[in-house]
Amino acid sequence: MATSQRKILVTSALPYANGPIHLGHMLEYIQTDIWSRYQKLRGHECHYICADDAHGTPIMLKAQQLGMAPEEMIAQVNKEHQQDFADFNIAFDNYHSTHSEENRVLASDIYLKLRANGYIKSKSISQLFDPEQSMFLPDRFVKGTCPKCKSPDQYGDNCDACGATYSPTELINPKSAVSGATPVMKDTEHFFFDLPAFEDMLKEWTRSGALQTEMANKLDEWFEQGLQQWDITRDAPYFGFEIPDAPGKYFYVWLDAPIGYMGSFKNLCDKRPELSFDEFWAKDSKAEVYHFIGKDIVYFHSLFWPAMLYGSGYRQPNSVYAHGYVTVNGAKMSKSKGTFIKARTYLDHLDPEYLRYYYAAKLSSRIDDLDLNLEDFAQRVNSDLVGKLVNLASRTAGFITKRFDGKLAKITDTTLTEVFLAKQEQIAEFYETREYGKAMREIMALADIANGFVADAAPWQMVKHDDQQEAAHQVCSNALNLFRILVTYLKPVLPRLAQDVEAFFQQTLTWDGLGQDMAGHEIAPFKAMMQRVELDKVNAMVADSKENLQATTEPEAPKGPLATDPISDTINYEDFAKIDLRIARIVKAEHVAEADKLLKLQLDIGGETRQVFAGIKSAYSPEDLEGKLTVMVANLAPRKMRFGMSEGMVLAAGPGGSDLWILEPHEGAQPGMRVK
């Protein structure tokens, strides 16, 4: 039971207003919506707000391609986004746009406060300029090879492969993503946010419990590398807010985008006078603020955003929760395979409750990627929701309606009810800590118990005997009460089903009412509540996604591993000759405390022992590695890590996680031999 009412503001990351929502996006909105609905079910004051991220060069250029004004395009996209979210039963309390007066005022206010407090620096920089388009190139419109890990085809602000951040001028072999031209350097004056000034505050905040352990560990790496001043300026032409007192200069989209959380809430406060903006955002606020985001935008939300808030006199979020990516059938979402599925394409074929449940069943508090296996998806929904949950009511409700005037009996044996109610605090804890998968397993285990009870009692046999009518009434009433408890537990996940069940019971399902005595309560006639997932509908959805691809006339992507990891840019022989690869024997392997992905390896390279930290924990146990031969980069500069010094790198193949295989040379190779 909730002991006191909390005041909570919860957000999802703002979808970019230049295209449709897809099933990868939907993971986050479903995750956040479940958490928000759970808080409201417990009686807390919870406001779930979001907005379209509507600024930046990509939007300006996309609008030009469509022959539209940017304002017209983002209004159209906003309408489409809101319809998709509504049809997936995402219950925002407010959905707005960063291109709003509220956001302009707040962005200017925060900037001016940062400037007054000495956190904005001005300097002349040399920036990449497209000579064919006569425009400065924002970081996302320069592509090249990552200067840190050498992955090709990376954007000019951060690397999707290794997570590093850098300036566009650090890219190797940069190209304009607008024209393909090789950019030239041109001087311009820019304003910078002095992020290094907040290092001590950020270190304290990131270790305060505000972040998941994996996120905090990643931030430690960034702290070790040193924080850099952040360029918050973009030159005209640009679609966004002009910087105060700086004609022709605009706020970089990542400055005003997170402020969009505040802008959307301010818009809600203007609609609802009883709400106080300052009660949630003032420095001394006692309300709670939580951000749900994808792991690709951790840097902005865990460094820039809390520092901006602190430096301008606002409160920091209580927590930032990151999740992983969505894969489909074990691979990256693919347009050519039809697994890059838009939200609208899914809705054209399947019930949104199916996906809400499947994502919930696989979500945890960790930052693991989630695989949408379409065959498993159909099997799990059919087994859990149709076969276990709804079936519990469908095979008992008819007897209550036809034989007992639609009224439930006084249950004399409350043993099962007590078992079900005893789980409420555990299930509540799982919802609160975002361990939805554990909650779903607990609930389905209870559903198994309830179905076993009905199967053993067999009320369909009881009703054939005059002397067993009351026993049948007891069994069916008990089963329906257990069904009511189960659906109440699932109400944050399955809001549409919960509505149907509320109509069936003719009452609202509440957490405080879990233990309600239902004796004499009248139910409505039972109606079908959920249909089985048909594989032909799943296949039709995939086929439609392929057709959508064909309509765009994009070339088919490469097949196999090259589809997600293309060949890197060509290097010459001299570059390759600099890499010293050696055979190494793994003498010892052990776990690293507080590291989720690392194993510590002691490597014999023929007369010398090296210590290497390798991110292969998900694929190997230490005991499986000891004694094996492998290949290491022997002349890689040592890297100081939080856990110790790493003196090289072992080579492995695979997409990552548990799908990694270290290279194992033939037994004829000996430690120390050079790989040529």
Swiss-Prot record:
Annotated motif 'HIGH' region, positions: 15-25
Protein residues bound to Zn(2+): C146, C149, C159, C162
GO biological-process terms attached to the record: methionyl-tRNA aminoacylation
Stored CDD domains: Anticodon_Ia_Met (cd07957), MetRS_core (cd00814), tRNA_bind_EcMetRS_like (cd02800)
Keywords for this protein: Aminoacyl-tRNA synthetase, ATP-binding, Cytoplasm, Ligase, Metal-binding, Nucleotide-binding, Protein biosynthesis, RNA-binding, tRNA-binding, Zinc
Known cofactor(s): Zn(2+)
Residues reported to bind ATP: K335
Name of this chain's protein: Methionine--tRNA ligase
Source organism: Shewanella oneidensis (strain ATCC 700550 / JCM 31522 / CIP 106686 / LMG 19005 / NCIMB 14063 / MR-1)
Lineage: Bacteria, Pseudomonadati, Pseudomonadota, Gammaproteobacteria, Alteromonadales
Underlying gene: metG
